[in-house]
Amino acid sequence: MNGTEGENFYVPMSNKTGVVRSPFDYPQYYLGEPWMFSALAAYMFFLILTGLPVNFLTLFVTIQHKKLRQPLNYILLNLAVSDLFMVFGGFTTTIITSMNGYFIFGPAGCNFEGFFATLGGEVGLWCLVVLAIERYMVVCKPMANFRFGSQHAIIGVVFTWIMALSCAGPPLVGWSRYIPEGLQCSCGVDYYTMKPEVNNESFVIYMFVVHFTIPLIVIFFCYGRLVCTVKEAAAQQQESESTQRAEREVTRMVIIMVVAFLICWVPYASVAFYIFINQGCDFTPFFMTVPAFFAKSSAVYNPLIYILMNKQFRNCMITTICLGKNPFEEEESTSASASKTEASSVSSSQVAPA
């Protein structure tokens, strides 16, 4: 084995030289230069500095403006809540451990950080699945006269938390475990060892199939069908200017959604899966550190993509920030009135987010 396994940790370095120490008790500067740990702390500070206000503002604006309290926005609010879970439960812990060079909070703190980071990430992931299904049902209309109402939204929110807990909870009760990873300053599921005492192998397989592969398939299917439906609608309307514009907007939004998902999660999942199927392989701490920390950036990507691209929400946010006045409202209202007739056929199909 090219790593050193302890009771509740796995350091990706052989202990032949005798320098490896528990990441709960000693700084891990033998894994990297001190400035590298400082860089991680600075990165986490950036995510907190951006993710906290954007997600909090999302909640505040939606509560303040009644017209935003639509069923679809329940899912978007839930997405913001999940991002805040990652910020408060994961990022704040990681910034402190990175500044100290090791996981100073011990195994209990590792469970805390790993649980909330995983929970927030999984709620966010399953929110994307619910959004994809909602778009598919509304735009592609596989069920005639389907309307996405408050009851559907509440069911969707509950579903995201049930699925997230079914992924983040088991390591706390003996099915797999949370251990420090990469430079040993953040915690995640143990992909590094089989650990038969906690049936680690079966949990990792379950996690990859149920909590990564299936969501990815659902998202690709739903948005793939959505793009096809929009193109068919455009062809039937002789590709009018408004329809072409709507098609471009929806296509751009879908591409950004899918690409953001892939950028955030595929590198982390791919590296984790590689390590899992190549137990004991030789890899540097950065091999897991970079994708693990990059996946955390989803807490910033999510509100930017799913909230800030929502025109209605954007107008309400500007109004809130500008203390009740929107300096762009007059210009936008003039533009909207000019295209109201053309856009009615598109909005009736609910092609764009509510």
Curated annotation (Swiss-Prot):
Residues 1-36, 97-110, 174-202, 275-286 are extracellular. Residues 333-354 are annotated as: Disordered. This is Rhodopsin. Photoreceptor required for image-forming vision at low light intensity. While most salt water fish species use retinal as chromophore, most freshwater fish use 3-dehydroretinal, or a mixture of retinal and 3-dehydroretinal. Light-induced isomerization of 11-cis to all-trans retinal triggers a conformational change that activates signaling via G-proteins. Subsequent receptor phosphorylation mediates displacement of the bound G-protein alpha subunit by arrestin and terminates signaling. PANTHER family: OPSIN (PTHR24240). The modification N6-(retinylidene)lysine is found at residue 296. CDD domains: 7tmA_MWS_opsin. GO terms for cellular component: membrane; photoreceptor disc membrane; plasma membrane. Phosphorylated on some or all of the serine and threonine residues present in the C-terminal region. Glycans are attached at residues 2, 15. Its main location: membrane.
